């Protein structure tokens, strides 16, 4: 087993935490995403960050928020999404890029969230069922068809996006120039996999979250164990024994209050 210092050194290399490993091109950024499996936009945890790997001066050094984004490479996050990689808000409401392989791990959870949210709230159910009938729809069309104001639709869609039930896609029109988004249900943007054969649904989702956590720890190389519970939105699927189970099953290893993927 590697020491924590050795793992952190490997993390610095694989997650491009040093200026000598800075991303130089969009193609290089896409290879970085495919290697890691998932990327956050900005640094907020041990999960690898696209903008951190750019090592570029901020757009507006004196300004918080967007001003701290890389001066010229900030569009790369959206451009990678335009190349077919999913951008999801399942990092507790923050956007995350994921590859198809990680999307497959997310699939049973996101499909379960569609069903749960349809049962939980009639307004959520109305939007989800409308998208099921109409297909992926632009915001303006949804406002008209559902009789909603822009702020009402924004408030309605936010929790659905946070849980992975719906997925937005940015659209830019040139003539006349305008920006909008298209909303789709998760099951309209990812083909999914065969259903489990008769297993207990709650147990299956517990295992799915475990699979996702292993992939996320692999992306990070090594991470403080206390962080893992805060990485994804679905606290209701979390069990405090989950990490113990993954260690017992030989999928994760503990190293000085951190975890890494077992060798």
Segment roles from a protein language model:
Residues 1-263:
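Long, low-complexity intrinsically disordered regions
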């Amino acid at each position: 087993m590697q020491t924590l210092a050795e793992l952190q050194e490997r993390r610095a290399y694989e997650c491009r935490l040093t200026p000598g490993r800075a991303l130089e091109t969009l193609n290089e950024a896409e290879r970085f995403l495919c290697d890691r499996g998932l990327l956050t936009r900005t640094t907020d945890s041990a999960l690898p960050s696209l903008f951190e790997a750019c090592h570029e001066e901020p757009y507006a050094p004196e300004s918080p928020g967007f001003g701290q984004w890389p001066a010229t490479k900030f569009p790369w996050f959206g451009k990678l999404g335009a190349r077919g990689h999913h951008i999801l808000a399942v990092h507790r409401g923050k956007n995350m890029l994921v590859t198809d392989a990680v999307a497959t791990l997310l699939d049973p959870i996101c499909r379960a969230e569609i069903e749960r949210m349809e049962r939980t709230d009639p307004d959520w159910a109305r939007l989800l069922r409308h998208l099921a009938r109409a297909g992926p729809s632009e915001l303006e069309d949804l406002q008209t068809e559902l009789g909603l104001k822009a702020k009402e639709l924004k408030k309605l869609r936010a929790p659905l996006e946070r849980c992975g039930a719906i997925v937005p896609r940015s659209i830019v029109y040139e003539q006349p120039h305008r920006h909008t988004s298209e909303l789709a249900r998760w099951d309209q943007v990812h083909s999914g996999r065969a259903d489990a054969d008769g297993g207990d649904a709650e147990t299956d989702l517990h295992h799915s979250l475990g699979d996702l956590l292993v992939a996320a720890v692999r992306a990070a190389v090594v991470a403080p164990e206390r962080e893992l519970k805060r990485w994804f939105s679905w606290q209701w699927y979390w069990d405090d024994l989950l990490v113990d189970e993954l260690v017992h099953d030989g999928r994760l290893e503990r190293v000085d209050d951190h975890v890494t993927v077992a060798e």
